[in-house]
Amino acid sequence: MRNTTIPPIYYCCAWYFIFCGGLAVLVPYLPVIFRHWNLSPSQIGIIAACKPLIGFGIQPIWGQIADYTKLHGQIHAFCLFASACGYGSLYFQKREFGRILAHVLVTETFGSGGFFLADNATNFIVSKHLERNPRSSISYGKVRLWGAVGWGYVFAPLMGLVLTEEKNAQFAPFLAYVILFSMASAIALRMEHHEKEVVDEGDDAEIVVMNDDEGENERMVGVASSSSRNRGGGGRGGRVGADGTPSKMKRTASFADFNDVSKRTFRIVTEPSAFLVFLLFLLMALSMALTDTYLFLHLETLGAPPILMGLALFFTCVAEVPVFFHEKKIKEFLGLDRSMLLIFVAYIFRQLGYASLKSFGSPWFVLPLQLLHGITFGLYWSVGVEFSRLLAPEDLRAAVMGFFSGMNSLGAFLGAICGGRVYDRVGGGSLFFIAAVGNTILSLVFALKMAFGKRVVPTTNTVVDNIIEIDMSGFVRLESSMPPSSSLSDAGERDDLDIDRSIDSRI
C-alpha cells in the first residue's frame, strides 16, 4: 500500500480557512453580544481598544520566546487553544464590565500569538516548497487567501443565518469558536517553522565557539569541513569558497539566550529606515481600525439595514481573495515602495467615499467602496509580512514578525481610542474625511521621496548583514564581492557583534 503524506502547504491552507472561520463566527458579533449584556457603547469601545494594546506588548514576546526555544509549533498551538478556552468560557462570565474586560485581557495575553506565528510558518513552508518545485506558482498570498474564503464566503454568513433564524442561540458563536480554534490548534502542531537542526559529526567537522558582544553567552557553530580551508578563509566570520560565495554553516548547539534574542531583535527593528516603515504600517493599521470599529456605526446613523452590513463584509472578501492570489505578481510589478503608496491612495478614496455617503443619498453606495479592502488589507498585510521576512535573519523571523503584528495592534488601539473621541464630537462622516486628509498628506510626502530617488523601504539590511540586499521586487540577493580573509582567525579579530550577525544571517 502506497504511503502518502499530506504536503505541508496544505496544512497552511487548512489552518487559515479554519482560523479565520473561527474569528468570523464570533468577532464581528461581539459588539452586538456585549450590547445585549447591557454594556454601553463606550465600554464596548474600551474593550475593543485594549485588545490590540495587549497584542502590541505581548506578540513580540511570544515571537522571541518561540525563536529562543525553537518550539514554534507547540507555542502556536498553545496560544490558539488558550484563546479557544478563554473566549469559550466568556459566555459563562458574569455580565459586568470589569469582569468581562479582565477576562478578555487575560485571554488575549495568552492567545495573541496565534496569527503571526502562522504567517511565519507559511513563509518558511512556501520557501521550502519553491526550492523543491522551482516552477510552482505558489506564494504566501495564494495560501493566505483561504482565510478570506473561510471568513467571508463560509462562516460569517453561516453564523449570521444561525443568529437570524435562532435569535436565542447566543451560545452558538462561542461554541463554534471553541470547535474551530481547537481544530486550528491541532493543525498548528503540523506546521513547520524552521529547518530541523542537523549535527555534522564527520571527522572533518569543526566547531567554532564565539562570544556575543557582552562576552556572556557562547554560541557553537559547525562550519564547513577542513577541505574548505584550502579554498579560502571566511570573510566576516564565515568561509568563502573559490567562487567567492560563503560556504554553508550549521548550528550544532542552542541559540543565544532570550536576552540576546531580544537585543538583536530590538537592533533590527529600531534601525531608522526600518523603523520608519514599521511606523507607516502602524498608520495603515490605524486607518483600518477606523473602518473596522466605526463604519457600521456610521452606516447605522444613515439608516442602513443589517443585511447591508453583512453584504459589506462579503464584498471585502470578494476583493481580498484575488489580491492575495496575485500578491506576488503585484509586488514584483510595483515593488514594495509603490505597493505601500498604493495602499495609502486606496485609503484616501475609501475614506472619502465613506465621508460622502450622506451626499450620495443612500448607504448602499458603501458596497463598491468595500472592494478597496483588497488593497487596504490584502496588499497591506502581504507587504508587511514580506518586509518582516526580508528584514530578519532566519532565527529571528518570528520575533520580527511579532513586532510587525505588534505595531499593527498599536495602530488598531490608537484608531479605536482616537477615532472614538473624534466620532463623538463630529460624527462618522467628518471622522473619515479627517482620516482621508491625513492619508493624502502622507501619500504626497511618500511620493515626493520616491520622485527624488529616496526609497522609503530600505534596500539594504545593514543591521543584520550588509551582504543581504532587499530589492524592491521582494527578492534577496547576495552581493558578488566579499571582503577577503585568509583565515577564520582574521575574521575573529573583527567586531564580535558583526561576526554574530554575519553568521546568523547565513544559517
What are the functions of these language-model segments?
Residues 1-6, 195-233, 237-278, 467-475:
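Juxtamembrane intracellular "pre-TM" segments in multi-pass secondary transporters
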Residues 2-52, 274-280, 285-312:
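Helix-loop boundary and gating motifs at the non-cytosolic
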Residues 30, 113-131, 379-393:
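Intracellular juxtamembrane helix-capping segments at the cytosolic ends
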Residues 41-42, 130-146, 306, 394-404:
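Loop-to-transmembrane helix entry/capping segments in MFS-fold secondary transporters
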Residues 57-71, 162-164, 322-336, 423-424:
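Helix-to-loop junctions at the C-terminal end of transmembrane segments
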Residues 81-95, 346-359:
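C-terminal ends and interior cores of transmembrane alpha-helices
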Residues 104-146:
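Cytoplasmic helix-loop-helix junction between adjacent transmembrane helices
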Residues 160-179, 421-440:
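A membrane-interface helix-boundary motif in multi-pass transporters
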